[in-house]
Each structure stands twice: as C-alpha cells, then as structure tokens.
Amino acid sequence: MVWAPVYWRHYGLQNFLFFCDLGNLFVTAGLWLESPLIFSWQATGLLLFQTLFTIDLVGALASGRHLIGGTEYMFDPHLALWVRLLSLFHVVTPPLLLWAIWRLGHDRQGWKYQTLTAWIVVPINYFWRPEFDVNWARGPFFREQRAVPGLVYLLAYLTLIPALVYFPTHRFLVWLTQRSRAKF
C-alpha cells in the first residue's frame, strides 16, 4: 500500500474521502477477507465512475482531448509522474471488482451499504474543506453549482445518486451474476 502514504503527503487527508480512495481501502479488505459484501458494496459505487475515468483517460491519450473530464491531473507536468501513475488504480479497479464478484458472488445488500456510505461521506465532504468539492458534494466536475441552494443540491445528490447509479449498478450485477452462473 505505497499508494496511501504518497497520496496523504501529496493530496492531503481530504483525498481519502473520495469514493475511489475509500474504495481502495475497502477493496484491500475485500481481497483479504474474500468478502462478496465488500466487493458488491464497492462495485455499486465505483464501477460506473471508474469506467468513465478510464474512458476519459484513454480518450485523452488517443486524441489529446478529455471526452468526459476528471483525468486532467494525469497530464499535469507539475505533478510527479510516479504520483500520477499511482492513479492508474482507477483503471484496474473495475475489472478487479467484476472478477471478484464473478468469483465470490454478488451480495444484494451492497448497494444499500454504498448508499449509507454516501449519506455519511458526502455531507462531510460538503461541510469540511468545501473548496476541494470531494465527490462533487457541492457540484459536478469539481465546480460548485449555483443553480439551486447548496443544501437542496446536497439532498438531491443523496437521493438521485443512489437511485440513478447505485441501484441500477446493483441490478446490472444481479443480472451479470445470474447470467454467468447459468453458463456453468
């Protein structure tokens, strides 16, 4: 886990409240414990966003343009290359999660744990060090939104992300595991 002390030094403590960084800690525990719950929990929160990260990174490498956004720091020459390379965990995480769920099975409670995690972590992100906009707690793409009052945005986030990301990802994982089990 070279990643954790390096990130702490370069990015600060608030960085560990990003779902992807929390996910690293949970995935490490999941690997150690071989826990379907931990992998399912993390998959519902990470699969979509880290897949989009990978698409943006590959798109930027291939075309020089960021198709989605979020990987611009990977091309920042002011940040040491070896620190940026540690962020490639975003690319490895989706296949690792899918492999673990294929191997261990999908726990149907995972999306609920991820929702609870969001309900705890995102308000912390909203109120603590708001200038970092961790997990987009104040607005998408690390920009504070101003269309609605901040607390309205926060409540919408805490309702819509579980409904539009976590639950559909859970349903996809249920479908995927049923399909893979039917083949064997």
Where are the regions a protein language model picked out?
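Membrane-proximal helix-loop-helix units in multi-pass membrane proteins
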Residues: 44, 48, 52-117
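Loop-to-helix transition at the N-terminal end of transmembrane alpha-helices
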Residues: 11-33, 37, 42
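Membrane-interface capping segments at transmembrane-helix boundaries
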Residues: 168-184
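Hydrophobic cores of alpha-helical transmembrane segments in multi-pass inner/ER membrane proteins
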Residues: 22-32, 85-100, 154-171
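Membrane-interface helix caps and helix-loop-helix hairpins in membrane proteins
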Residues: 5-13, 77-84
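Aromatic-anchored segments of alpha-helical transmembrane domains
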Residues: 1-5, 47-57, 117-129
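Membrane-interface transmembrane-helix boundary segments in multi-pass integral membrane proteins
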Residues: 128-166
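Hydrophobic, lipid-facing residues on alpha-helical transmembrane segments of integral membrane proteins
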Residues: 47, 112-123, 156-168, 172
